[in-house]
């Protein structure tokens, strides 16, 4: 299998910006958030199960999952959160493995927000953490998602702390305000990852 770089960070850290910078260099992406959306589109067994469990109110008028309402329900009810996780996590994991196995590039960026929380570190060859202060996270989430401070606090409380995430980092990108610094940092890491991927390929070939 291709060399796997897990790209992780808290909500509002700018993972998508960093992932897109790698994609601009021709690096393939496997994004857990996109997979999580794809497995609950209308007509999927997962969306049917969620609708049966929570009722039709959990759908938008056009039949899609009302993600904001679901998030509200599970962040205030641990039992419901566990139910949703037990339904979706195996499906996300299965589809992630399928996509990763199809990659033929030297390495892949696996965008996985809850890498630390869901104890998935063993599936990656290397971990890249997008780091940002909690204050900037809160500001970005409020602006982007239009949710209130209490909901943001609930989301942050459910995620690994900044220090926990950094403890597992092999590499770090600081994504506070200096957007100009991102491109050269990503280019530098890209070269490093190509070397690591080649070294791993040689090791596997020698075994």
Curated annotation (Swiss-Prot):
ATP binds at residues 12-17. One of its GO terms (cellular component) is cytoplasm. It is found in: Cytoplasm. Pathway: Cofactor biosynthesis; coenzyme A biosynthesis; CoA from (R)-pantothenate: step 5/5. Its EC number is 2.7.1.24. SUPFAM superfamilies: P-loop containing nucleoside triphosphate hydrolases. It catalyses: 3'-dephospho-CoA + ATP = ADP + CoA + H(+). It comes from the Bacteria. Residues 4-200 form the DPCK domain. One of its GO terms (molecular function) is ATP binding. Transmembrane segments: none annotated. Keywords: ATP-binding, Coenzyme A biosynthesis, Cytoplasm, Kinase, Nucleotide-binding, Transferase. It is an enzyme of class 2 (transferase). One of its GO terms (biological process) is coenzyme A biosynthetic process. Belongs to the CoaE family. Catalyzes the phosphorylation of the 3'-hydroxyl group of dephosphocoenzyme A to form coenzyme A. PANTHER family: BIFUNCTIONAL COENZYME A SYNTHASE-RELATED (PTHR10695:SF46), DEPHOSPHO-COA KINASE-RELATED (PTHR10695). This is Dephospho-CoA kinase. It comes from Photorhabdus laumondii subsp. laumondii (strain DSM 15139 / CIP 105565 / TT01) (Photorhabdus luminescens subsp. laumondii).
